[in-house]
Curated annotation (Swiss-Prot):
It catalyses: sulfate + ATP + H(+) = adenosine 5'-phosphosulfate + diphosphate. Belongs to the sulfate adenylyltransferase family. This is Sulfate adenylyltransferase. It comes from Picosynechococcus sp. (strain ATCC 27264 / PCC 7002 / PR-6). It comes from the Bacteria. It is an enzyme of class 2 (transferase).
Amino acid sequence: MSTPSGLIAPHGGQLINRIASDAEKQEFLAQGDRLPRITLDARAQSDLEMIAIGGFSPLKGFMEQKDYELVVEEMHLSNGLPWSVPVTLSVSEEIADPLKEGNWVRLDDANGRFIGVLELTEKYHYNKAHEAINVYRTDEEKHPGVKVVYEQGAVNLAGPVWLLERDDHPLFPKYQIDPAASRAAFQERGWKTVVGFQTRNPIHRAHEYIIKCALETVDGLFLHPLVGATKSDDIPADVRMRCYEIMLENYFPQERVILAINPSAMRYAGPREAIFHALIRKNYGCTHFIVGRDHAGVGDYYGTYDAQKIFDEFDPQALGITPMKFEHAFFCKKTEQMATSKTSPSGPEDRIHLSGTKVREMLRRGELPPPQFSRPLVAAELAKAMHD
């Protein structure tokens, strides 16, 4: 389904906007001291922001129990739309008990600033182990996503939200592009087909290869790295962003690429998160989404191509965004170029496999990744950052 502008429609048909108007904001601020308050952690705050700007359309707030249970068990909302990851606000029993359904709740950031409100429609208990097994395919607490589930409160608070305060990103304000703005940018450029690429790593040669393969078949690329909460051993966002800038300045046609930050937090939910990431990019205006090996995976919890296979479980029209599935790319010594097993004549001994993990390991040892791994300008930037 497309909009009158010719762009793909947001998930559910309407781009949600839950940013309070000035008048609404003043009304809520005037009540602030009288409202019960909750302090949001980094993930809940990024979820609030993504709901408000329409990145999580059709969600208007944190999930009620009927949606939560359907998403956990069947990967659909109660209105039938595909949705694969629960978006919830979890608090302790002590915080939840005095809150009354039908009332407003003040949402504060970690500094105690009043940034949003929740119209509490429901509070409910949930089964953490059930969520972990269904969403993450494991209940092991060493899995970073499962760890978050087990550490969060026992009660979910549900209801529509309004965002009152939102800062420019402290490091990347010029790349803070909301779904309404990305859609306007695609339309201005005349792009009818746009491929989205999600990453939390610097772009190495395997990434570059599959991105350029995808770009051959569409009008534009939406490079959308995640800068919300990630694992502690991931390369810092400021270093990654500089690497993306270097890649675009030197190795891509700049008029066919838009770089923007994705403020949402990683769940590390593997296959389910691949669906989640695709739907988010649909809301930003993408028609296609790149799914490579072990998308949004961690450790050995998911099969190499499980994140591609999960798309086959959905009606393509209901998803409304086309996955572009790529095999693991490598440097082929026989042909001296990037390839996959679909295009390379070489055997395993002539294939140099690349990964963000290998790059990080080399950098920690003080080694520069070879040009088959990483573009020299990017490798130099990574090495500089590692030893600053």
